[in-house]
């Protein structure tokens, strides 16, 4: 009883009210910028470019997305500069490898992309969990996480295809980045056209895991956020 009363008093305290009002006034455009960067990355990768330079450009786009997510989530400057350092090291190493004559740096660079795109959802979710209000900013952040998950799996499939000795897909030997991106989002949304299927056991297991996580995320997180946003609007 004492703990419940203490929690109630904290929520009703002026400082708590001020914090809630401050969160409500936080601009939604910050996660909107993250969303725009994700759409730009998606459009670039889906256009079907090929070559080592594609992975370098993807590092730039994913690095910018991670930095925007860190800024939108209110992360510390130390974490922000650490992310900048990782991106710069990856770009310098990848560019140097191309200049010295390394024929294929796609695999290592897409592993770096996997790290960057995997860190961004963690940062965003950590920020959203701490929020006391559900508003447009919260919903935009949750949508960013959903798209980031699809890109994370596409980079994971790309890495498997790059390092594996056998083709990733049963229907195609030389898959492009666009093919992996297409397969990932078709799997996550459970559309499942069937024109691409994973050939190996690891690819199939990850595809099933992506479909499960994607559907659970939609029917629980997004649905609950949107419904709560609607109730708040009617109550106000």
Language model region names:
Residues 77-89, 106-115, 134-145:
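Cytoplasmic-side transmembrane-helix entry/capping segments in multi-pass membrane proteins
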Residues 27-42, 84-89:
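Alpha-helical transmembrane segments
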Residues 1-26:
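Short, Lys/Arg-rich, polar N-terminal cytosolic tail immediately upstream
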Residues 117-165:
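Pore-domain transmembrane helices of cation channels
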Residues 47-62, 83-84, 106-118, 178-181:
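Structural signature of hydrophobic alpha-helical transmembrane segments
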Residues 49-51, 152-182:
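Outer-pore turret/helix-boundary of cation channels
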